Amino acid sequence: MQVVKRDGSLQEFDGNKIVEAISKAFNACCPEENKEVITAMVADMHLWDGITIEEIQDVVIETLRDYGYDDVASAYSQYRSEQ
């Protein structure tokens, strides 16, 4: 699956990047959460070919909120705005 980066270039999707970013947000809020929970959330995300980085970030925030991790979604959103 191809992802459209901020500069418009295409890159092969790497789910590990999402896991890493979510892990950082969890560490800021809930360090007791484990990587298996995060990996399961990423597996549940509905992504599509040609998705943009911004759309992926929106899906991440929505998924975190769906799982009841509002604090983590806020931390991720803050991390996102710093990028």
Map each language-model feature to its residues.
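Long, C-terminal-biased catalytic regions of enzyme "large/alpha" subunits
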Residues: M1-Q83
